[in-house]
Amino acid sequence: MNLEQKSDALYDFTVTSLTDILNAGVDVCMVQVGNEINKGMSGETFMSSVAELLKAGSSAVREVSKAAGKDIQVAVHYTDIDKQGEVAKITADLEKYGVDYDIFAMSYYSFWHGSMENMQDMAEYVQDTYGKKVVIAETSYCYTSEDGDGSGNSVSGDGDLVDGYDATVQGQADMLRDICAAADEADIM
């Protein structure tokens, strides 16, 4: 498929699936277009092309939302928020290419994406510079370093955990509590 065909397919799929979901009685308040799309989306890697896909998805959400008399928010989702330059470039490109969205969704894994203060700084940058809401779309923390499925873990528990947060049930609970508190402090949804 070329870019135009992909954009049309994404638009059609979003209209159909969102309409079906609403018709089933689900109260949808947000639709995320793309998932951790720093490196591209649907085989497209140039930001100008990714922006076309995002605009197609956003347009579909806006159309269905209006027809249903709803206020459904549009989110775009990125990772690697520990790199301020990356967040600045992504948000500048979203603006440059005219992507219509309400929420900048980000993944925050404390063992990969830096301190909670950095997460707050990135959120505040997006909020202050572009007036967008920010949400943490993904996070987690391990409660054990044991391999439970034979596939190998993303985090080994050997030097890659965050100081003060053990790989225990309590360590996981403490981390998630502290992430939620830091997010709340920075007005992150």
What is the predicted function of each stretch?
Residues N2-Y101, G114-M122, T129:
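Active-site cleft segment of glycoside hydrolase catalytic domains centered on the general acid/base Glu
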